[in-house]
Amino acid sequence: MRIAATITKEGYIEKLPDGPHIIIFDTQKENTEKYDNPGYFLKEGRRSAIVDFLLDQKTDVVISVPEAFCSLSYGKAKQKGLKFIRLEKSLPYEEVIQNLSKYLENLTDSIPEDELAK
């Protein structure tokens, strides 16, 4: 399973376009890949560009915080079968990965509309 998150320079999970890096943790290989966030500097279509990137990287799960996705990017992610680990707030990425089994218990294929960016 490949689990992705957008992270800040300080290592906190953030909304898709709001962190300069994307980290993908591969549970089978037990390794982490770090990429520059392709939507970080865009003016438009930021979230959709990131979803396209995540799909190109064969991501299975996205760790998300409220307003990580907009309705368009969420629709694309859902249609392509991405699953979500929903956090109530930004947390350190390492903390989530260290407790991954706990977070995977709440793995979902949907995000409530009130958590999408307007």
Which residue ranges define each predicted feature?
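Non-catalytic interface/targeting segments
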Residues: 1-45, 56, 82-118
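Well-ordered alpha-helical segments embedded in enzymatic catalytic cores
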Residues: 46-50
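Mid-chain, well-packed structural core segment of small domains
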Residues: 53-90
